[in-house]
Amino acid sequence: MSGAGAAGSVRGLRVDGLPPLPKSLSGLLHSASGGGASGGWRHLERLYAQKSRIQDELSRGSAGGGGARAAALPAKPPNLDAALALLRKEMVGLRQLDMSLLCQLYSLYESIQEYKGACQAAASPDSTYALENGFFDEEDEYFQEQNSLQDGKERGPPRDLMLPVSPLPSGDWILESI
């Protein structure tokens, strides 16, 4: 395979039985895994917006070419090249949908983590500042957990020990999900 080297350069994106990513999408994923760690979910949202534009262009192209598909199965392509082109177009659409769902899932994951932090802050009696200004910082959560652990040592064995949640870097989370 000629595209195997390009897909092999991005760790974890090659799955047995599936062809490598098209160059356009592998570039997006490579930039998300390499440079997305600083931007977090906002970077993924930008990728999602770019994916949506590409998907809209593809849908406009297919609508202009023959209208919406009325039948469940499209007409058989006249030759092998046309069949491969149709398959490529479908694969691009599926990969874009996959990226869209992945971005939404990651955004949901971060929202859940923020909500868990806010709930922990609300349960803690000495964290009124985090709730008053509406912001909750991961550093605040870390220091609150450290203080509660030190207080717990003074009081005796804890009744309800909660493990700290360590969020995955965005690039690692994406690669593990794929």
From Swiss-Prot:
| Domain of life assignment | Eukaryota
Q: Name the family the entry cites.
A: Belongs to the FAM89 family.
Q: What name is this protein filed under? A: Protein FAM89A
Which organism does this record belong to? Bos taurus (Bovine)
